[in-house]
Amino acid sequence: MGQKHAVGGVSFRESVDHMVDHAIDIMGLDDGLREAMKACHSVLQVSFPVEIDGRAEMFTGWRATHSDHRLPVKGGIRYATQVDQDEVEALAALMTYKCAIVDVPFGGSKGGLMLDPKRYTRDQLEAITRRFARELIDKQYLSPAQNVPAPDMGTGPREMGWMVDTYRRLFPNDINYMGCVTGKPVEHGGVRGRNEATGRGVQYALREFFRNEEESDRAGLKGDLSGKRVIVQGLGNVGYHAAYFLSREDHALVTAVIESDGAVINEDGLDIDALSNHKLAHGGVEGFQGGIFEPDGSKVLELDCDILIPAALEGVITTDNAASIKANLIAEAANGPVTFEADAMLQARGVEIIPDAYCNAGGVIVSYFEWIRNLAHIRFGRLEKRFHEARGQHIISGIEMASGAQVPDWIRDELVRGADEFDLVRSGLDDSMRLAFREIMDKRRSNDAIKDYRMAAYVLAIEKIARSYRDIGY
C-alpha cells in the first residue's frame, strides 16, 4: 500500500516531490511555480457511520485534488486498510502528471476509503459505497463537471455502478449524470474496453518501446516482444490483462507470476487464463499445476528475465532488492512500484524503466473516452459503422470488376467490417500511447541532463501544466 515508512525514510509522496524538484531544476522554473506544482490544492476527509451486523461502524475516507487547472479532475478510488492522506495526495499528483503526459484534458485527483473489502458482504459494501458517494457528492467531490472518480485497488465496475446510481437519485435532472464516474458497467454507461484498458496500455507502451530500435538496444534487448521473458508481479486486473495480451498477441513468455500467497514459475511460459481461473477458484496461485510454486514471491522478483512488470502495490522495489533485480527493462504497471532511491540504483546500473506516469495511463485515457461517450449520449461507431462497411464493399466490388479476380473471403471480411466501439477505443488508446512515448523519447534525447524516461516524462508533463498555469493566470 502506501509507502509512508519506506526504506530510507522517503514516502511515496516525497518520492513524487523529488522527481518534480529534479525536473523543475532541469527546466529552470521559478520557485513560485515549483510550489504551485507540488501543492495539493484541496483534500477532503470524511468519517461516517454505516450499520454493519446491527451496529454502527465508522469509516474514514479521503478525496484529494492536486490540480484543477483542467476540469473535471480525474482519478480512482481505492478501498484498502492502509490507505491514508499521504498516499491519496501522492496519487492525485501522479494523476495530474499522467493526464498531462498523455494529453487527457483533466486535472489530477484520487480517493481512498480505509477498509478491507473482503471483510464485508456485497450488501454491506453497497451500503458503504453509497454512503461514501453521498459524502463526496455533498462536498462537490463527485460530479460530471468537477470531479470524476474511477475504479482502483479494491473497487471495480460494481462500485462505480452504485456511485453513479447514487448521483442519479440525488440529481435526477442532470442529463449528464452518467459522466459522474467512469469504469462503470457497459449497461450503465460504461465504454467497451475500459476493463482491459490499463493492462492493454502497458502492452502498447512496450510495443512502442520495441518499435524504436535505438531504445531497445539501450536496454540490451533485440528484436520485438516475441520470446521475451516476462515476470509479472500481481495478477489483478492490470497484471492479468498485460500478461494475457503480451503472451497471446505478442508471443512473449510470461515465465513467472507473483501473487500475495507466493509465485508460480514456468520457463516455457505460463498459461495466463488457466492461472487466473485457478486464482479465482482457490484464492491464490498455490496448487496451480502449470508451473512450480515458490512461497516467497519476493525472491521471484530477482529471477533472470528480460522484462519485469510490477502491477500491484507501491514500493515493491527498494534499496533492499534493487541491486538484485536482473531485468533489463521494468514497465511500471502499478503506481510507484520503485522507490526514489531504488530508481537511482537501477538507473546507475543501466536498467531502463518505463515510468508509471506513462506506462499505466491506459486507464485514464479510456476513462476520458467513456466520459466523452457519456456526454455525447451515443456509443462510438453507431453513426458510421455501416457507412464504412458499405463503402468498403463498393471498393472491393470495384477492384473485382477492374481486375476480373475474386478477392479472398478473409481479405473481404477484414476490409469490409466496420469498426465497433471496442475497435475504436483500442485504436484511440494505441494512438495515445504511441504519441506520448514519442514525446517522452524526444524529450529525453533533447537534453543531456535528462537521463531517463521518468525524468523525461516529468519534464514533459510540467512543461504542459506550467503553460496552462501561465495561460490562466496562476
Report each predicted region and the residues it spans.
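Rossmann-like adenosine-cofactor binding region
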Residues: 262-353
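Glycine-rich phosphate/diphosphate-binding loop of Rossmann-like nucleotide-binding domains
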Residues: 189-302
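Conserved active-site and cofactor/substrate-binding residues in soluble primary-metabolism enzymes
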Residues: 11, 15-18, 41, 83-86, ...
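Short, Gly/Pro- and small/polar-rich lid/capping loops
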Residues: 4-45
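Glycine/serine-rich phosphate-binding loop and adjoining beta1-alpha1 elements at the start
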Residues: 80, 100-226
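Glycine-rich, N-terminal phosphate-binding loop and its surrounding beta-alpha-beta segment
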Residues: 45-53, 58-117
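Adenosine-phosphate binding glycine-rich loop
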Residues: 3-11, 209-210, 324, 328-474
